[in-house]
From Swiss-Prot:
Keyword Hydrolase: yes
Similarity comment text for this entry: Belongs to the uracil-DNA glycosylase (UDG) superfamily. UNG family.
Pfam families: UDG (PF03167)
Keywords: Cytoplasm, DNA damage, DNA repair, Hydrolase
Classification lineage: Bacteria, Thermotogati, Deinococcota, Deinococci, Deinococcales
Annotated protein name in UniProt: Uracil-DNA glycosylase
Active site per the UniProt annotation: D82
Keyword Magnesium: no
GO molecular function: uracil DNA N-glycosylase activity
Domain of life of the native organism: Bacteria
Annotated compartments: Cytoplasm
């Protein structure tokens, strides 16, 4: 089996087809997307960025959301904007951070809402891997970022790729709950067109908008929507010790 560097490393020749093999069944679902001209340009851009300085997440974590949540298992999609831009934080899952990293403010606010909504007991870590393994696709709209510069990789092509992911999830015949927090994420609602799906929208859990986020009870609403469709609800309680991704 190829190692992560060969699967997710960047090609030396920008004109060469990117050697990208998406994890599991996503490779078939998104067949042809990584050979599109925009993706070749994006891949070359990320290569240049990695050569110039730190870019997060690490190459082996680039597609962690897809690796941990196969297409066939997706029941919930929680959309973030771009990865955390501090050293050691991002590991390819929206809102989640690596074990041992301080829980960021937005995730602290998510924990507060979980506590009030479903009786959640916050762990000391910020790893959401256990959600991903239950079918919660923790997807950022932009999959890479330059260290210390939020949104530095916006508008380079990732949005086209992740829009393709959202469209693919929209085509699932079983119910998926799309969770769109904040104005940026809410613009993606137009990609969700199939009537079996449910969209839950609210303000973002960022400290700048948390007053309008708290009290929206998204987690109990997600589970109610899943159960109404005969699907197993998500166990939102995170383990005391983080799962290894």
């Amino acid at each position: 089996m190829s190692d992560p560097a060969s699967l997710f490393g960047l090609p030396p020749d920008p004109d060469a087809a990117p050697p990208v093999h998406l994890p599991g069944d996503w490779d078939e679902v998104l067949r042809g997307e990584t050979s599109q001209p925009y993706f070749r340009e994006l891949w070359a851009f990320v290569q240049r960025e990695r050569e110039a300085g730190p870019v997060y997440p690490a190459p082996e974590d680039l597609f962690s959301a897809l690796r941990l949540t196969p297409y066939r298992d997706v029941k919930v999609l929680i959309l973030g904007q771009d990865p955390y831009h501090g050293a050691g934080q991002a590991h390819g899952l929206s809102f989640s951070v690596r074990p041992g990293v301080r829980v960021p403010p937005s995730l602290q606010n998510i924990y507060k809402e979980l506590r009030d909504d479903v009786g959640f007991k916050p762990p000391r870590h910020g790893s959401l891997v256990s959600w991903a393994r239950q079918g919660v696709l923790l997807l950022n709209a932009v999959l890479t970022v330059r260290e210390g510069e939020p949104n530095s990789h916006a508008g380079k092509g990732w949005e086209s790729f992740t829009d393709a992911i959202i469209r693919a999830v929209n085509e699932k015949p079983t119910r998926v709950v799309f969770v769109l927090w904040g104005a940026y994420a809410r613009k993606k609602a137009k990609l969700v067109t199939q009537p079996q799906h449910v969209i839950i929208e609210s303000a973002h859990p960022s400290p700048l908008s948390v007053a309008k986020f708290l009290g929206t009870r998204p987690f109990s609403r997600i589970n109610a929507a899943l159960e109404a469709a005969g699907e197993t609800p998500i166990d939102w309680q995170l383990p005391a010790e983080p799962e290894v991704a």
